[in-house]
Amino acid sequence: MNFNKLFLIVILAALLLLGQTEAGRLKKLGKKIEKAGKRVFNAVQKGLPVAAGVQALGR
């Protein structure tokens, strides 16, 4: 009998934790990560020709 109550509580907790959540927080975090990735990508694009030129001078 106690097992049934415990099983029911575990199932309810799993449904609450794994159910649909508000995407607002996750969406904001994803946008911040995407923005940081774009900044890094743009910085690499700007810096790569400079680094290639320095390497060519060293040879």
From Swiss-Prot:
Record's keyword terms, sorted: Amidation, Antibiotic, Antimicrobial, Immunity, Innate immunity, Secreted, Signal
Similarity comment: Belongs to the cecropin family.
Major localization listed first in the record, in broad terms: secreted
A GO biological-process term: innate immune response
InterPro entries, sorted: Cecropin (IPR000875), Cecropin_insect (IPR020400)
Function of the molecule: Cecropins have lytic and antibacterial activity against several Gram-positive and Gram-negative bacteria.
Modified residues (Leucine amide): 57
Gene from which this protein is expressed: CECB1
Signal sequence interval, chain numbering: 1-23
Keyword Secreted in record: yes
Species: Culex pipiens pipiens
Name of this chain's protein: Cecropin-B1
Compartmental location: Secreted
Domain of life per record: Eukaryota
This protein's record includes keyword Lipid metabolism: no
GO CC entries: extracellular space
PANTHER family attached to this UniProt entry: CECROPIN-A1-RELATED
